[in-house]
Amino acid sequence: MKSSLTLLFLAAIGYTIAYPPSSDYDSGYGGGGGGGGGGGYGGWCGGSDCYGGGNGGGGGGGGGNGGEYGGGYGDVYGGSYGGGEYGDVYGGGCGGPDCYGGGNGGGNGGGGGCNGGGCGGVPDFYGKGLLDSYGGDSYGNDYYGGSNGRRNGHGKGGKGGNGGGGGKGGGKGGGNGEGNGKGGGGKNGGGKGGNGGKGGSYAPSYY
């Protein structure tokens, strides 16, 4: 009888070590990182009334930090502002909803190429875009653009953003965005960007 109780006691201790009770901090599931953003669009329209590059794809949101705030709203806080007319300034950053999530925000999406005269940004009303206006180059690298956005309606869409990192608790990071947007040309130019990466799987916090 005594030996049975001893074995039972040891088994209980072993189970507690292997599967400790969750605390308030690390309970629940760590969210997976958001998927990477798609490629950029080419621009609004061609000719002298061109408004420079279209929107770049944003990066994915970061994973959650030990709780239920995984990856959601990645499009809003983690990436919608990536690329596009503001180049690579607003990519990534916050993780889950309202920045409660842990993990890293995704990489920046690429800025759209120019569509019409000149490169990036607002037109100067003489048929050319202002070369150093907001817009980034065709890959979203520069905050103030540059002259790399391709002229005459052939801007190249930006690359997809990188997926966010996994949160505390084991969620995998999201995949990278796929492909580039097509070059812009004419009204509503620019093809659809690539698909975002798949979100990570959830996993219990003690994994």
From Swiss-Prot:
> Do the record's keywords include Signal?
yes
Q: Which UniProt keywords apply?
A: Repeat, Signal
Start and end residues of each stretch annotated as Disordered:
150-207
- Keyword Signal present in the record's keywords: the answer is yes
Please list the residue ranges that the record marks as compositionally biased, kind Gly residues: 158-200
Highest taxon of source? Eukaryota
Extent of the signal sequence: 1-27
Provide the protein name.
Answer: Eggshell protein 2A
Gene from which this protein is expressed: ESG-2A
